[in-house]
Amino acid sequence: MSNIIKQIEQEQMKQDVPSFRPGDNVEVKVWVVEGSKKRLQAFEGVVIAIRNRGLHSAFTVRKISNGEGVERVFQTHSPVVDSITVKRRGAVRKAKLYYLRERSGKAARIKERLNAK
């Protein structure tokens, strides 16, 4: 029974997801429905967490908008997510960057990773 579930989940997974890690700046383009119109909305920020669970994988992106921190959790393989673009690679030593929530301004900066693997 579990083989059937795995096969169905494998078919549903996107193949064009780029490789990114916590600390990277990414731009996520999301389909937004407003009334009868559909349009793409971009959300650009720092990846602060990644949850790898196959089809149920998700990642959290944080940005500062008008001086207020905004975090959004995206399902990696969701049809709502149109594209993910890595803008800048960040050099961090932790998997979860929740400490950035308490920091602002220059203290919240992340060094750029030079050797992109």
From Swiss-Prot:
Similarity annotation: Belongs to the bacterial ribosomal protein bL19 family.
Cross-referenced Gene3D superfamilies: 2.30.30.790
Pfam families listed in its UniProt record: Ribosomal_L19
Purpose: This protein is located at the 30S-50S ribosomal subunit interface and may play a role in the structure and function of the aminoacyl-tRNA binding site.
GO process annotations (BP): translation
Alphabetical list of PANTHER family matching this protein: LARGE RIBOSOMAL SUBUNIT PROTEIN BL19M, RIBOSOMAL PROTEIN L19
Molecular function in Gene Ontology: structural constituent of ribosome
Name of the molecule in the record: Large ribosomal subunit protein bL19
Keywords: Ribonucleoprotein, Ribosomal protein
Entries under HAMAP family matching the protein: Ribosomal_bL19
Cellular component aspect of the GO annotation: cytosolic large ribosomal subunit
Cited InterPro entries: Ribosomal_bL19, Ribosomal_bL19_CS, Ribosomal_bL19_sf, Translation_prot_SH3-like_sf
PROSITE patterns the record matches: RIBOSOMAL_L19
Gene: rplS
Stretch forming the signal peptide: none
